[in-house]
Structures are given as structure tokens and as C-alpha cells.
């Protein structure tokens, strides 16, 4: 343990902001007068470099101006925080997890963000809301590139508060360019809104009190890479590890601390775990970060999947023999919430070949879900109760299995899903 403490201490990078003295803000220099002026910007996607897909601009939901407030209930029109500053929402790009982002899509959103920020100047602060696991063609640190380019527009004195997913990646450049930085403390991310509010609360608090940039930041890269399926904070060891973060922020001289698991499904130098802390007391900040990093390293071999892992045949046998219903089987090899294509048909093809599901007296199974635009269009045309015969899946990733043909009866048609837009349920076999 003593040897590991030495290693982690050597890895700790103290990033000094103002070298312990409060830096001059735009308000100090007379550039800004009146209420606090805080901009909002950010691009967020979790994108796997191992997926054959690419995410274009059409894959993003881009909001601008006052429409952005809808994503932040703590900034609603009647919220206390809304009255504490003039909020200037610029551009917010969001996409469901997917493949690497095209350079054209990234540049289009970035350039528009920069223009909108320039028009919003002068500023006291920026709420920088990102995921942290965006991959872009030709870049190995997109979020670091984005914040560096933003700095070229807003300058070094504007206070930047960054909010991230705990499965994001924190490069040294992103850590340096962010004055305040925080992440979710729960997986599943039940505290997403709470974490974003913490980012804005810390930002407003420092601006209102005239504290400026924190004097010290500690950034510790931890050489661990874990998949999300092993990092639920509802079970150990992540439960106890993340339970330590909150108390760390109550220490004198520590404003906030965070642990990033990192993102396993992109082949980039920044993909690893990170621990950070920041505040105005150098010793307290360093100690908080090192204690969290040491705990993380100590339990690194204890992370495990949240459920037993096995082959499809074994899982199906267990499901059919189980008295507990429904029995849920997760195909985590094609996880669309982590950047997988979500249309690999291998598992569905295996299920369609099993005779027990053809028997009218046999078991039933719900497969959720597989993309199939042609099937959806046909289902809408024939309506509920109609017969469909169309292919689905393997439009993005056909490396393991081709598209499957589904012949069956339309059981339901649902409109309005935020990602899929239209969903249909087709009964096949028994």
C-alpha cells in the first residue's frame, strides 16, 4: 500500500490557477457591469470508436437560446437561480450513444457555439455541460479541443464550471481549462440534474462572493479501465467509493471533488479513470484527491458485473427454469446505451430458431428491441392486427449476422418516443 501511495502521489498533478491569489475577473477590470452574466454551452454524446457507425449532425438534438432552459429545471423561470444572473444559453447538442462523430458535425456545432458565445460577451461565467466521452474523427480529445477553442473566444478570466457524466474522460487539457468541474456520483445516473445544479451553484457562489478561480486543482489519472456494467454505485465497491465524495467536499479548503470511471469503448489516450478535487487550500485539495484515488486503486479488482454472466443458451435455460417472471437477459455485447450499434441481429436470430417459441403452448419472450424502418413503415400501413413481412436490424453492424426477416402480427404501434420516434410490437411465432 505504501508503494501504491507513492505511485499515486507521483501521478497527482496540481494545477495552479492564480497561484493561490484570486485572478482579476472581467468585472474587476470594468468589462462587465450590472447583474452576473453566465453563458450555457455544451455538446454531449457517448461514442464508441469500435462501432462501424458514424454519428452525423442529424443524430444530434441541437437546441438554442431559451429552449435550452427546458433541460435544466433548476433554471426554470421561477427558480431562485434564474434571478441570480443573466443567463445566456448559446447551443446545446445532445445525441444518444453511438458511433464516432463526423468531423463535419462537430465543427458545425463548435463554430456555431463560438459565434454565439462571442455575441454574448462580456461574460462572468460559463456553464459547460458535456458528457465527456465524445469521439470525433481526427481528434483524440474532443472535449479538450472544444473548451480550448471556447477559451480563445471568452478569454482566460471567465469562470468555467464543467458538468460531466462519471463515465466521461478528463484529459489534462480539459482539467486545466475548467476552473470548476464535477461529475455524477451515481450509476445509474439518478443524480444527473442534481450534479448539473451543483455545477451552476458552485459557479454562482464563487462569482457572487468575488472568490474568482479556485487557487488549486488536483488531477490524478488512475490506470484503471472498467466497463459501465461493472460500475453500478448501488453495489460494492463503487457504492462505498462514491459515498466518500460528498464528505470530502465538506472539508475546509475543498470546494468539490469527483471520480470519473472513464469510458472503456474508445481507443484514445485519455480513456482511463481520473480523480479530481479543487479548492483554495493546497494541502486539503491534494489530500482529498489522493485519498479517493488510493481507495479506487485499492478496490480495483473488486468491481464485477451486476448480474451473472454466461452464454445465451445457458441464460435461456435458466430463464425457462425460473419460477420468477419476467426473467431479464441483457445482451451487453451490443449495448446501445454505451455506443454499440444496437442493431446486431445474432441474438434475435438464435431466438427465432428455437422451437419452444414456435409452440402455441410454449413460453413467450419479448425481444427489445431492433431497428427496422421498413418494418415500422409496413406496420403503420397495415395497422394493429395486420400482417407484416419485412427485414430488420444489421443496417449498421452486420459483421456477426445479417438482417433478420420478421413475419408476424402487429400488436401495438406507439408514437412519440424521444429517440425512436415510432415503435411497433410484432408477435412472431407462438
Q: What positions do the PLM features span?
A:
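N-terminal amphipathic/basic leader segments beginning at the initiator methionine
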Residues: 30-82
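Internal, active-site/partner-interface "lid" segment
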Residues: 207-238
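Hard-cation-handling environments
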Residues: 36, 226-430
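Active-site histidine-anchored catalytic micro-motif
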Residues: 39, 43-46, 50-52, 103-110, ...
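Bacterial signal peptide processing site
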Residues: 20-22
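C-terminal motif of bacterial Sec signal peptides marking the signal peptidase cleavage site
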Residues: 16-18
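Sec-dependent signal peptide recognition
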Residues: 2-10
